[in-house]
């Protein structure tokens, strides 16, 4: 039946005429000569069928009989790739006026069918121009498998895109007269809309240059392409709707040689996947024939994210799940309608992963049991305690040297305005014991090493901003819940007052664990700790709690330089909130060459006494510092002018006699003048400073509390 449908009148009429001529020749051969008797079985000449007689048509073989144009047995060719998608082919010869040909009634041999037609013209009979059929057929593996060429750009949801300007090239002159307009009954087949796009109005303003494809014509176009152009023009003139206009202009369903919307006449079949002008054969176009707004393949282009970055505390994987998907789930859409591909600039996931690693490393600091070697220690901890503490005459006990913690934890998650990944900032070499006012998040019970308690905080705590009417008993009652304590303030014994005179006091706890409990109960605001205290007239007034972290007493800036007491200065009147790291930064900014800074603390309570020391790595910086005599300390809320003196030791021998004249005793005097800068015993000082120009030098002696002072020298 399919072979019957593929035959055309143009092929059957010459066959019928040839058979009629053969019958006439046979009749002439069988006709008797004049005067002979006629055989009874020979038909008369009057009974010979005429070509014009309609009775000759049934006499033909069933294989050569064409179907009636408008008969009841008329069938329509369906697509072998898409069932239900029919084609209509206007005949190449003009039909009689009384019998208009319906679309799809017959198909010409030039129509490229995937079925064998038995013809010998491979170019005209192939479904796609330029591919030779195999045994009258064409292999389907020649087509891309991931995109069906049935759905061309005209069948996409953007079917209403204007593409008229790409068909301005006039078709070659047709050898046959143009077809008349299609009858009205053929239009309903073109009125079908895509269910995905009920209206094409929003896409009417899109330029056809962005989505259309210029047809590539061959040097020898077939006659069927001319018929297609003529039929398209006729259909465009008779169409009334916008859909009909786009359909007829694109000739998607009315062109006999171009029945598929994604193909043009004479085009290389491998370019049927939406190849633009200038694109090589076999290269997929960046436009998808299903939808021009989408790409048919996964893109490797990294798109900038459209949506704001997620919260930094949201735990998720580094890479998106669909970063390397091969289907259309990772398409790059112009408006980012789908989840974006992997963005290398999207660093919030990496930061979360690093924070999780740091949080895991810091778990031992949150109340867990420590190994026998002690808690983790930073490199600055070990560097200072193992390399420099002995030279300064300071004895520290250092547990945890076997368990080194590389990252500083003193301000992890506590200090506002800093990155949790880089907590060092100005204290980049500070150890891991925590900030004095920022340690509540890292507080833990007192560390123990072989049964020996290791303290983290001074047992003396500053409390500021107290209510003016609060007395000693009320202060004690407010903080007694943390442990036994004594309330003190400056000149308390002499004042004989029960109220702190300046609104601040000191809490002297009996146990260091009480200080840690107090820190845990405080609230943090802008890097400071507060606790609510009530008085007879004021209820729940926030007061500032300022503990002193023992690790803030010393800071090593340059561990490669040895500490020389002859290059160390004494800084008096240092504000108590100032830490060693801040003192080192100020001095290094002023004079340079700072390798160590320390805060003098009380030997019993280990609370700052208001003085500090700074060691330099070179003589020039040391002389510049002591020559200035005064320096302005400015840091945050601190702005104070302090005095600078040479740091005097009490265990130095005389630099002149090396103890020979004083019986091996330590030198009691130190000359701070830049022309001397030496230790002298009494005999050597008298002999050296009796010379001209040195009689006005004043000696420095070390008094209690490591504070040097000038003393008058008594001449004998």
UniProtKB/Swiss-Prot annotation:
PROSITE patterns: RRM. The keyword Ubl conjugation applies. One of its GO terms (molecular function) is translation factor activity, RNA binding. Activated by NEURL1-mediated monoubiquitination, resulting in the growth of new dendritic spines and increased levels of GRIA1 and GRIA2. NEURL1-mediated monoubiquitination facilitates synaptic plasticity and hippocampal-dependent memory storage. The modification Asymmetric dimethylarginine is found at residue 309. Following synaptic activity, aggregates to form amyloid-like oligomers. Aggregation requires an intact actin cytoskeleton. Interacts with STAT5B; this inhibits STAT5B-mediated transcriptional activation. Interacts with E3 ubiquitin-protein ligase NEURL1; this leads to monoubiquitination and activation of CPEB3. Interacts with CAPN2; this leads to cleavage of CPEB3. Interacts (via C-terminal RNA-binding region) with TOB1; TOB1 also binds CNOT7/CAF1 and recruits it to CPEB3 to form a ternary complex. Interacts with SUMO-conjugating enzyme UBC9. PANTHER family: CYTOPLASMIC POLYADENYLATION ELEMENT BINDING PROTEIN CPEB, CYTOPLASMIC POLYADENYLATION ELEMENT-BINDING PROTEIN 3. This is Cytoplasmic polyadenylation element-binding protein 3. The lineage of its organism: Eukaryota, Metazoa, Chordata, Craniata, Vertebrata. The gene is Cpeb3.
């Amino acid at each position: 039946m399919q072979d019957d449908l593929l035959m055309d009148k143009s092929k059957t009429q010459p066959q019928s005429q040839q058979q009629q001529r053969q019958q006439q020749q046979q009749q002439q051969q069988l006709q008797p000569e004049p005067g002979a008797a006629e055989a009874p079985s020979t038909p008369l000449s009057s009974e010979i069928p005429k070509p014009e007689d309609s009775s000759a048509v049934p006499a033909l073989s069933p294989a050569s009989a064409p179907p009636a144009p408008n008969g009841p047995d008329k069938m329509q060719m369906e697509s072998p790739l898409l069932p239900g998608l029919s084609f209509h082919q206007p005949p190449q010869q003009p039909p009689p006026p009384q019998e208009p040909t319906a679309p799809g009634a017959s198909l010409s041999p030039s129509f490229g069918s995937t079925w064998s037609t038995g013809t010998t013209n491979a170019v005209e009979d192939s479904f796609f121009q330029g591919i030779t059929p195999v045994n009258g057929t064409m292999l389907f593996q020649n087509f891309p498998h991931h995109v069906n060429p049935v759905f061309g750009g005209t069948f996409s949801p953007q079917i209403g895109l204007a593409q008229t300007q790409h068909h301005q090239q006039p078709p070659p002159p047709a050898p046959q007269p143009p077809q008349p307009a299609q009858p009205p009954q053929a239009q309903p087949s073109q009125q079908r809309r895509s269910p995905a796009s009920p209206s094409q109005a929003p896409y009417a303003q899109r330029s056809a240059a962005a989505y259309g494809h210029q047809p590539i014509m061959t040097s020898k176009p077939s006659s069927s392409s001319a018929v297609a152009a003529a039929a398209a023009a006729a259909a465009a003139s008779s169409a009334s709707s916008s859909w009909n206009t786009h359909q007829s202009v694109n000739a998607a369903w009315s062109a006999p040689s171009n029945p598929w919307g994604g193909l043009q006449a004479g085009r290389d079949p491998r370019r049927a996947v939406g190849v633009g002008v200038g694109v090589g054969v076999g290269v997929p176009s960046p436009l998808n024939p299903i939808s021009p707004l989408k790409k048919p393949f996964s893109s490797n282009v990294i798109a900038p994210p459209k949506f704001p970055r997620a919260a930094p505390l949201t735990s998720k994987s580094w890479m998106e799940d669909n970063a390397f998907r091969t289907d259309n789930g990772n398409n790059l859409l112009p408006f980012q309608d789908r989840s974006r591909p992997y963005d290398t600039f999207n660093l919030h996931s990496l930061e979360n992963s690093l924070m999780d690693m740091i949080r895991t490393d810091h778990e031992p600091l949150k109340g867990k049991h420590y190994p026998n070697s002690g808690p983790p220690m930073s490199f600055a901890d070990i560097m200072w305690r193992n390399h420099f503490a002995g030279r300064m005459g300071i004895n520290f006990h250092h547990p945890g040297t076997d368990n080194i913690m590389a990252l500083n934890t003193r301000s992890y998650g506590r200090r506002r305005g800093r990155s949790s990944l880089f907590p060092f900032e100005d204290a980049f070499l500070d150890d891991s014991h925590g900030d004095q006012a920022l340690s509540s998040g890292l507080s833990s019970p007192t560390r123990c090493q072989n049964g020996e308690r290791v303290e983290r905080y001074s047992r003396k705590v500053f409390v500021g901003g107290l209510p003016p009417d609060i007395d000693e008993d009320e202060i004690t009652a407010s903080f007694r819940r943390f442990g036994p304590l004594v309330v003190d303030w400056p000149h308390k014994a002499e004042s004989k007052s029960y109220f702190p005179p300046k609104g601040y006091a000191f809490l002297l706890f009996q146990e260091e664990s009480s200080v840690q409990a107090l820190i845990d109960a405080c609230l943090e605001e802008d890097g400071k700790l507060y606790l609510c205290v009530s008085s007879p007239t004021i209820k729940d007034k926030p007061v500032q709690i300022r503990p002193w972290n023992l690790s803030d007493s010393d800071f090593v800036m340059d561990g490669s330089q040895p500490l020389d007491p002859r290059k160390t200065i004494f800084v008096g009147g240092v504000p108590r909130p100032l830490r060693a790291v801040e003192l080192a930064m100020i001095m290094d900014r002023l004079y340079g060459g700072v390798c160590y800074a320390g805060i003098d603390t009380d030997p019993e309570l280990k609370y700052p006494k208001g003085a500090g020391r700074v060691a330099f790595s070179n003589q020039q910086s040391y002389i510049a510092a002591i020559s200035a005599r005064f320096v302005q300390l400015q840091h945050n809320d601190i702005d104070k002018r302090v005095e600078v003196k040479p740091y005097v030791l009490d265990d130095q021998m005389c630099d002149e006699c090396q103890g020979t004249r004083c019986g091996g005793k330590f030198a009691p005097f130190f000359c701070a003048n830049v022309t001397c800068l030496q230790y002298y015993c009494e005999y050597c000082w008298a002999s050296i400073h009796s010379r001209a120009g040195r009689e006005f030098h004043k000696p420095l002696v070390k008094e209690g509390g490591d504070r040097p002072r000038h003393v008058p020298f008594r001449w004998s």
